[in-house]
Every structure is written in structure tokens, then in C-alpha cells.
Amino acid sequence: MSITMSDSSAYGEELMRERFEHLLKAYEKMALMVAEQEEFNAKIEDMALKLLSEKYDNEAYQAELFYRLSNCVEKVLHNKISITDLKTEYEEILEQTLKKECKAYERSCIENVKLKKRTEQATAYYASSSSEP
């Protein structure tokens, strides 16, 4: 009878040790996931601040364009600018706007490619980690 008890207690200890190791691995995995989530959140915050900054810059630029155009209209109304000067000013405004929009489009394309790559990597990572026991 004493042999059975000692075998049983050894089996119980081994089972507890295995459970503890499993819990420890699960905890380490969760700690890693929390760290990754915090890093991801920081990146999202940085991107949000960048977008807000770009929006503010864009709105300021649009206000500048509006005032430049309204200044041209005022000069035309008061006959203070010739048609050729008005055309030149208007073409400069259009050229600057197109350059700015092209740069913004290029940046957004680059960001979209980066985001797509990150999404694919994250999907692959979480698909592989969820299939692990």
C-alpha cells in the first residue's frame, strides 16, 4: 500500500510540475504579446500624431492658398493687376498645389505598401502562433 502511495505522489508531483511549466510558458507568451501590443499602440499613436500634423499643415496651406487667391481677386476688382500677372500668379499657385499633392500621394502610396507588409507579417505571425499548442 505504501508503494502505491509513493508512486501516486510522484505522479502527482510530475503532473504539477508539467502544469506549472505549461503555465509558465503561457505567461511568457502573454507577456511577449503584451509587449508587442504596447509597441503596436505606440506606433499607432505616432502615426495618428503624424496624420494630425499633416492635416494641420494641409489646412494651413489651404488657408494660405485661399488668401493668395482672394488677394488676386481683390487686385482684379481694383484694377491693380494685369491679366498676364494674374495668369502667372494663378499658374504658380496651381503648380505649387500640384507638387504638394503629388508628394502627398507618393507618401501615402509608400505608407500603404508598408502597412500592407506589416499586416501580412502580423497575419502570418499570429496564424503560426495560434497553431502552436
Swiss-Prot record:
GO biological process annotation, one example: ascospore-type prospore-specific spindle pole body remodeling
Main location as per UniProt: cytoplasm
Identification of the protein by name: Sporulation-specific protein 2
Compartment annotation: Cytoplasm, Cytoskeleton, Microtubule organizing center, Spindle pole body
Cytoplasm is among the record's keywords: yes
Signals that turn on the gene: Induced during meiosis by the transcription factor mei4. Protein levels rapidly increase during meiosis and then decline.
Keywords on record: Cytoplasm, Cytoskeleton, Meiosis, Sporulation
Secretion signal span: none
Family of this protein: Belongs to the VPS13 family.
Record keyword Metal-binding present: no
Function recorded in the entry: Involved in sporulation. Plays a significant role in modification of the spindle pole body prior to spore formation and is required for initiating forespore membrane formation. Assists in the localization of spo13 to the outer surface of the SPB.
Note: The sequence is 100 percent identical to the C-terminus of vps13b.
Quaternary organization: Interacts with spo13 and spo15.
GO annotation, cellular component aspect: cytoplasm; meiotic spindle pole body
